[in-house]
């Protein structure tokens, strides 16, 4: 999922659909899995394993229930059990219980698990987000303008592969009589287009890329297809199969796939599709699998029950509560059957938490509650220990490797899910060579680089093999190739504006693509962008745009700069030219302007006031680096831009050629606690010949380039004010984080303008403006909500600006 607001909406829809579908078979017998015959064989193997242990002592099964964030309490329970030296012979778990149980089964100590869950950035782990630095400049700007984005429609080859899988697992008679493109009749064609379109829509808030890659970093040595009895401690987990509404009991397979499926909360994570199954969170069928432990013949069953019962009216307040209630509803029958099975039941007191309580404070408290709940059962556990006798949990195999702390050597690198040509292209981008030791950071850098191409739904990795050197396999899942996006904003300058975007082939790695963007409302514009991306060399681009700007349409304030103009622009340029950290683009531009003469009111500077209608030919080049970690509220990084344009010809009227140089820089210079100091500097100089009026310097407002591309922001002036040929603005923002997503910013800036640099410093010819403001910001899912009060020496008046939504 590539957009947060879109994800929240689809999350709710997916939850409702999942609950509705599974509720229809809510009373299906929960203990019978999707493959009873295979499950029976696996069960016999486990029974034989326990029988052998029983020759020496009673056998012990540890069952960990699901519960989302509440599952962190399992670590505290395991820590206490280890302190009593109670041996565990098999671990069973569902959802988060499956995750924690798998770590224990892989040989991780409670102390290591404690450290791991505290080190996870859960806000990132539960999404597919990658650091902003891996995303292309164009994609970054798209995401910072578009509120809802819907990728749609698979490529012909991807859809053909999908149909083959559907036919393989569902049966050809349930699909098409003949799989082909360019259908023989209109009904076939319509059906294929419809199914392709609907099938390409997102199935969850996230595909689970980040959480899957967490598993991959912790399970090295156990990532091949295997019997889970061969883990250091035998392990079983449960998922829910949506087609049959039966539990999928994982006794063997790929451990990462099992873990990803057992905690695939509908709507939060996309379902796991494997071997003809559509798998979601196991809690919807068997959230507390003590019945499986009983069937395998464990003599002693210790259960950790995180169920909080049904919530009442006052307790259903947020997404986490709704998800918890839905899971409890669907798994209620199996839970009621299983709850009395354990010999000892440990119930941490976690009523104030829900499935999504992953903040640092909650995680620490939940973990401690697990310790306390286990300690509360000390008498019962001591009694069990006397029955079991001496001994402790023994690992049957080597521990898994955590590549967070222990780099591993790899023998080869393969990228699956792409063509040979694309594989070579991506191999060059990631730059990982075989026969070297690599760390988690190196692998995640490669994964993020590939995912940052915006060509895949998700990118995951595996380290196959039981010992070094391992095979690094990067798995790429192609997604839809087209997209539709919409953004919206209300502010006090333009009232309501809507941004629409439609892209064809924009999620392809290579080849031609087309993108169309239109702004509807005050000062509308439309832009068509065609580009051709190759495996090597720069991207070739052609843009054509129309823009109408009328600053006098709404009388909401005063401005010295009255502007009404019509603009048509064509550009032919090269992009994706890399120069160290800079993205470079260069090309040829034709700019047609038809200006209203009112624009000349109160304009200072050495400009050509006669060229109000003309087409201007120019060549230009831009260098830009952007390392901010967030486009709106960064806490680290910088932006640096350098631009040059040479306007050399007027197609309708003769002009004297002139130049324009621009420079901008912004950084988060210092952060102390909740305070961030953000200095910035921007400058533009138009010189040589007789610069035409459309190229004059402009400053004001909160959005750069709102009325003219060269407009610079200035705290203290709304709308826009025309300035002389040289304009420089120095600014510092002091941003204080009040609490989560809420900020208060003090802004101070100074602008200086002069007609010629040789006159700079001359009191009579240099014009300076001081501006200051105080801004409150809320970082909402629909974009920043901001209100600022400001003042400038330009008019010696105070002003106000309100914005709700993304800037565009």
Cite the ranges covered by each PLM segment:
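Bacterial Sec-dependent N-terminal signal peptides
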Residues: 1-36
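Patatin-like phospholipase
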Residues: 24-94, 102-448, 452-464, 470, ...
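Acidic/histidine-enriched alpha-helical segments
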Residues: 311, 382-399, 519, 637-640, ...
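Gram-negative/organellar outer-membrane beta-barrel architecture
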Residues: 441, 460-463, 468-621, 625-628, ...
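C-terminal outer-membrane beta-barrel translocator/porin domains of Gram-negative envelope proteins
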Residues: 483-488, 619-739
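Short loop/turn motifs that connect adjacent beta-strands in outer-membrane beta-barrel proteins
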Residues: 507-513, 535-541, 577-582, 629-638, ...
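Short glycine-rich beta-strand segments
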Residues: 547-551, 591-593, 641-649, 684-686, ...
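C-terminal hydrophobic structural anchor segments
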Residues: 735-768
